[in-house]
C-alpha cells in the first residue's frame, strides 16, 4: 500500500538511503511514540513510560544517524544504566547522539564525519591527525585497514575500548 514515486535528478555523486523506520511490531506496540519509534529519554536511553525497558540502535527515537557507530556508543550506556537500575540506582551514563559516517569523496580519500546531537562535531581523533571536516588518505586507511578488525575482533565481542559512555551530568 506504499505510494511509489519516480524521481529523476542529475548528479555527480549520489548517496541513496532507504527510509529508516522501526519494524511493524514496534510501531504498533505501546513502546512506540507517535512516529513509531521506541520512546526513550535521549540521554539515558530508558523508556519514558516503562522504566524497566531500555532501547538502542535502529528502533529508538533519538534523532541521530541509525548506524553501527551510533549503536556502538549506545550499548555501553544501556549496559551501565541497566546495571545501575538493578542496583537500585538512577542512570549513571548518558548518550551524546554520536554517529559516524565515512564519506568517500574519491578512491583513497574519505571524510570521517563524526557528530552528535544537533550536528555537534564529536571527533575521535585530534584534528591535526584526522580532520573530520576534510577528506584525507589517513581517514581512508583507518576505514580500510583498522576499522574492520576493530569491528569484527573487538566491538562485536564487547571489547571495544573507545566506546566509554559519558557520565550523567544532571537533569
PLM region spans:
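Short, electropositive alpha-helical surface patch
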Residues: 70-79, 108-116
Amino acid at each position: 500500500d506504499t505510494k511509489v514515486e519516480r524521481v529523476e535528478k542529475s548528479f555527480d555523486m549520489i548517496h541513496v538511503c532507504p527510509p529508516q523506520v522501526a519494524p511493524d511490531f514496534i510501531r504498533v506496540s505501546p513502546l512506540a511514540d507517535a512516529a513509531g519509534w521506541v520512546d526513550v529519554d535521549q540521554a539515558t536511553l530508558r523508556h519514558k513510560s516503562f522504566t524497566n525497558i531500555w532501547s538502542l540502535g535502529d528502533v529508538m527515537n533519538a534523532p541521530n544517524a541509525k548506524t553501527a557507530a551510533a549503536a556502538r556508543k549506545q550499548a555501553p550506556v544501556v549496559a551501565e544504566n541497566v546495571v545501575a537500575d538493578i542496583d537500585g540506582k538512577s542512570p549513571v551514563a548518558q548518550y551524546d547522539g554520536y554517529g559516524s559516517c565515512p564519506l568517500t569523496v574519491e578512491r583513497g580519500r574519505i571524510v570521517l564525519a563524526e557528530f552528535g546531537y544537533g550536528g555537534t562535531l564529536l571527533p575521535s581523533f585530534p584534528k591535526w591527525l584526522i580532520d573530520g571536516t576534510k577528506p584525507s588518505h589517513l581517514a581512508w586507511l583507518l576505514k580500510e585497514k583498522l576499522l574492520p578488525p576493530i569491528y569484527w575482533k573487538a566491538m562485536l565481542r564487547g571489547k571495544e575500548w573507545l566506546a566509554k559512555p559519558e557520565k550523567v551530568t544532571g537533569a
